[in-house]
């Protein structure tokens, strides 16, 4: 992603020296294959200075003076688009929220509905969740080929920073329990959010999450009721045909979660686990690196949004 110029980072809770160390050494991904160091005002990555800010009010950030075009809002505090618009007040042109959002102009899942993005009217964009990015490409293929009547999903998801490392208080009593010691059932809006990118599936999908004691890689276990009878072979053939190898991938290898660490696809269908019951009930398993896969789509979306904004501006000027 050399086409993207990284201008600044705003994090009130992180100092440059801490950021440089965490960037350089990752417990899951290993050591960064490049150079990173801190300086007084930020960090230097591969010789490029990236300035740091610690501003709690995004509207006060110097985005206009710095020529910032696209802000990736990843704090988790500004998932309401009305609050995220503070970045636009500060001078940015577009905001991408790296989470499910409310009041956003559009939710985009690459490989599913990115063609609906209109730079003239979509200024605050949600990227949904990593789980929605895994499920939606699968649902798109299955619905187009066979028709989805309804479905239930379980995401078997690696634990996240919103869980407690040891038993401690949390508004969700299950997430209050030690994440590395328990299977933790919890809610997810990922299934329902598919309807934001595939409107024909509104009200047809639901599900929940099972957080498990692994640091990275998750899977979606989804059961669809279809509008026609199918076989395992037909379902796998449709998924194999629909897999572009970039967003949606297909495998017949008997792999486990650690094999998917560092994979950049949003969704990798495990064809060996596809099942059909009663003709029109199908179970599909698809893996995803919930860190690398989502981060890759986020960078690609940032590039797409920036490029289309620039093209739209040039067209307007001409």
Predicted feature locations:
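Active-site-lining helix/loop region of Rossmann-like oxidoreductase modules
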Residues: 4-5, 16-17, 31, 137-242
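A common structural junction motif
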Residues: 239-248, 305-307
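Internal helix-turn-beta structural module
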Residues: 261-299
């Amino acid at each position: 992603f050399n086409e993207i110029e990284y201008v600044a980072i705003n994090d009130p809770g992180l100092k440059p020296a801490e950021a440089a160390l965490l960037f350089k050494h990752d417990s899951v991904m290993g050591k960064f294959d490049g150079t990173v160091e801190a300086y007084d005002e930020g960090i230097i990555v591969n010789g490029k200075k990236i300035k740091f800010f610690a501003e709690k009010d995004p509207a006060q950030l110097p985005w206009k003076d710095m020529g910032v075009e696209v802000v990736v809002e990843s704090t988790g505090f500004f998932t309401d688009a009305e609050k995220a618009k503070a970045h636009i007040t500060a001078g940015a042109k577009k905001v991408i929220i790296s989470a499910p959002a409310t009041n956003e102009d559009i939710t985009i899942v690459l490989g599913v509905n990115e063609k609906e993005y209109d730079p003239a009217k979509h200024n605050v964009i949600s990227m949904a969740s990593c789980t929605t990015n895994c499920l939606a490409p699968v649902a798109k293929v299955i619905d187009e080929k066979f028709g989805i009547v309804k479905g239930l999903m379980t995401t078997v998801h690696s634990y996240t920073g919103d869980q407690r490392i040891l038993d401690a208080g949390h508004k969700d009593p299950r997430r209050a329990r030690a994440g590395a010691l328990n299977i933790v059932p919890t809610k997810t809006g990922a299934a329902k959010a598919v309807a934001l990118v595939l409107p024909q599936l509104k009200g047809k999908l639901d599900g929940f999450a099972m957080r498990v004691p692994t640091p990275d890689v998750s899977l979606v276990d989804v059961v669809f009721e279809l509008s026609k009878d199918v076989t395992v072979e037909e379902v796998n053939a449709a998924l194999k045909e629909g897999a572009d190898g970039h967003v949606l991938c297909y495998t017949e290898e008997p792999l486990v979660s650690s094999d998917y660490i560092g994979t950049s696809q949003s969704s990798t269908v495990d064809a060996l686990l596809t099942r059909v019951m009663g003709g029109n009930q199908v179970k599909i398993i698809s893996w995803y690196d919930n860190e690398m896969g989502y981060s890759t789509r986020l960078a690609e979306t940032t590039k797409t949004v920036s490029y289309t904004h620039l093209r739209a501006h040039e067209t307007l000027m001409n």
